[in-house]
UniProtKB/Swiss-Prot annotation:
<comment type="subunit">
    <text>Homodimer and heterodimers.</text>
</comment>
<feature type="topological domain" description="Extracellular">
    <location>
        <begin position="54"/>
        <end position="82"/>
    </location>
</feature>
<keyword id="KW-0961">Cell wall biogenesis/degradation</keyword>
<protein>
    <recommendedName>
        <fullName>Casparian strip membrane protein 2</fullName>
    </recommendedName>
</protein>
<feature type="transmembrane region" description="Helical">
    <location>
        <begin position="116"/>
        <end position="136"/>
    </location>
</feature>
<keyword id="KW-1133">Transmembrane helix</keyword>
<keyword id="KW-0472">Membrane</keyword>
<feature type="topological domain" description="Cytoplasmic">
    <location>
        <begin position="104"/>
        <end position="115"/>
    </location>
</feature>
<feature type="topological domain" description="Cytoplasmic">
    <location>
        <begin position="1"/>
        <end position="32"/>
    </location>
</feature>
<dbReference type="InterPro" id="IPR006459">
    <property type="entry name" value="CASP/CASPL"/>
</dbReference>
<dbReference type="GO" id="GO:0005886">
    <property type="term" value="C:plasma membrane"/>
</dbReference>
<feature type="transmembrane region" description="Helical">
    <location>
        <begin position="169"/>
        <end position="189"/>
    </location>
</feature>
<feature type="topological domain" description="Cytoplasmic">
    <location>
        <begin position="190"/>
        <end position="194"/>
    </location>
</feature>
<keyword id="KW-0812">Transmembrane</keyword>
<dbReference type="GO" id="GO:0048226">
    <property type="term" value="C:Casparian strip"/>
</dbReference>
<comment type="function">
    <text>Regulates membrane-cell wall junctions and localized cell wall deposition. Required for establishment of the Casparian strip membrane domain (CSD) and the subsequent formation of Casparian strips, a cell wall modification of the root endodermis that determines an apoplastic barrier between the intraorganismal apoplasm and the extraorganismal apoplasm and prevents lateral diffusion.</text>
</comment>
<feature type="topological domain" description="Extracellular">
    <location>
        <begin position="137"/>
        <end position="168"/>
    </location>
</feature>
Amino acid sequence: MSTTIDVPESSNVAKGKAVLVAPPRPGGWKKGVAIMDFILRLGAIAAALGAAATMGTSDQTLPFFTQFLQFEASYDSFTSFQFFVITMALVGGYLVLSLPFSFVAIIRPHAAGPRLFLIILDTVFLTLTTASGASAAAIVYLAHNGNQDSNWLAICNQFGDFCAQTSSAVVSSFVAVVVLVLLVVLSALALGKR
């Protein structure tokens, strides 16, 4: 008794092997760009929300005051700082909401739709971030140096903590600007080399 079974071929022509998985499309670097995009978005979220939180909590009251007058410096005393806090919070919110689109770009690196959507909105929010950072930087400069022509005195000699917080918030916003510029450039590279 034999334990092997012989099965003859059904036809005279030998069949070839079929490829079950299509070979990967060229341009695997796009997946690396998409991963870098996701990581940069996380960094921009930290910079934008950190700038908004730092500026939003900047408040200092001097320890001396009179019966009718108390000396206080707060972000809500300056409309440029209010604009800064609102804008940086919006930018941080947008960046959080853009993470799923960035994740789709990782899964489907050759899809142009999510990439085009991100580059348009990244450019809009880059503009907002730059505008709010520049307006806050102008006020921080005046707080540090004053302006003799308009009788604006430098207040950072008295309100050192307030000025340190607002300065660090402005620096953090410009870190977010640099990261957003990198995101726009990465998206443009991924879209351009089709």
